[in-house]
């Protein structure tokens, strides 16, 4: 869904309106980009999917990287300590795990779930919420996200029903209004899911044939990280890169999970990901406290290649955090 602001950006950069000097600069940049297509960028250029926007992908992801760090679109990393009194990391985890189940029940696209959690964290960074209303914040945030992403979205009554009618239709609509006002209607933002699609495509290049477990395993690790409050501090692109790193390690434990191509694509070195990857590994091994029952059950299904049940080493070799060496 394209916002008015995005439309304005596109209209302001119409090549037909450019002066000869501006057009020469645009043409120079495009030629330079085409001459330098290699590694991860080459994958985008080879894609026959018009939605992948191969020619413009570098500019698009550069814009998304700028957008993901905008203060207005980021939650406080310590909002539970600074803003909340009744809410704890554990209660937040229970809510998010339940919302994973709700998203499955309503057959929502994955981006709706990611946006929902983003809205919850941003709202709780601004407003103190009583524990009794936390579930209402969750379903109202999902109601907003479903309007933004879904072609056929659930009705307000469906969200009331899923809470066993703990809240009324008026409660949900009022909380929807409160969330929208608090977020100043800034609803579009990149999520972990935004970056995963491209990172996974690059990560598949090392396999002779596409690995069927890689994508669902990356998604599983990303959803586990959504449950964990300590991951709120990480930007979406870093979470996505960390999920790919750990997924590759789980699938091929004797091979270095990172590569020159992935480093170029993600803009992260292996060492940049260490803290986040180790948290994800703890979550995967259930060494961290937190509710993840719904997420684990979801990814134990055949349609997700049973990735929640893949065995893994207890820790990663120290050498995996060193810079990738090109041979």
Swiss-Prot record:
Keywords: Cell cycle, Cell division, Cyclin. GO terms for biological process: cell division; mitotic cell cycle phase transition. PROSITE patterns: CYCLINS (PS00292). Pfam families: Cyclin_C (PF02984), Cyclin_N (PF00134). It comes from the Eukaryota. The keyword Cell division applies. Belongs to the cyclin family. Cyclin AB subfamily. GO terms for molecular function: cyclin-dependent protein serine/threonine kinase regulator activity. SMART domains: CYCLIN, Cyclin_C. InterPro entries: Cyclin, Cyclin-like_dom, Cyclin-like_sf, Cyclin_A/B-like, Cyclin_C-dom, Cyclin_N, Cyclins_cyclin-box. This is Cyclin-A3-3.
